[in-house]
Amino acid sequence: MASKVYFSKTITAEKVLQMYTLLGKQLPGKVAIKVHSGEEGNQNFLRPDFWKPVVDHVGGTVVECNTAYPGQRNTTKKHLKLFETHGWSRYFTVDLLDAEGPDLVLDIPGGKVIQKNYVGKDLMNYDSLLVLSHFKGHPMGGYGGALKQLSIGIASAHGKAYIHGAGEPAKIWTANQDDFKRSMADAAMSVVE
């Protein structure tokens, strides 16, 4: 069966909500809305005011996880401050899924590279997941988007190093890139199943 593709020349918050409602999908239970908070000083992140109609429509909570590398997103305190700086906290409740450990370990029985995924334990508090992504070139993952949001984005700080290192966190920046990409696919599979 062919997939339906929706396209609009008009890009507004109202048009995105209209297109979402065309899907006719109801997300059951408590909804996590995965976003990328954006890096400090960078303008390449989704704007919270643009997504407010969709978030309000599904009644979701904005979620994210801390990073595995130094910066303004590697601790809960700094990351929440960045969410505030970028405007997310002005509109929404933000839940950092890995704010407190221990990690939730998801099995990946059919994983091609990794057989476990380490995610923020607060993921267990949600019944549904809506991923909001912006497409971008990424130096390690090829492209950043929904697959990266479902894998690296849901992973705890340790989980991010585990995925980047293709199962060996110490190789976070040196693992084979094809194995890293396969690890991302494995991790994403564990989140959606």
Regions found by a protein language model. Name each.
Residues 1-193:
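N-terminal and secondary-structure boundary signal
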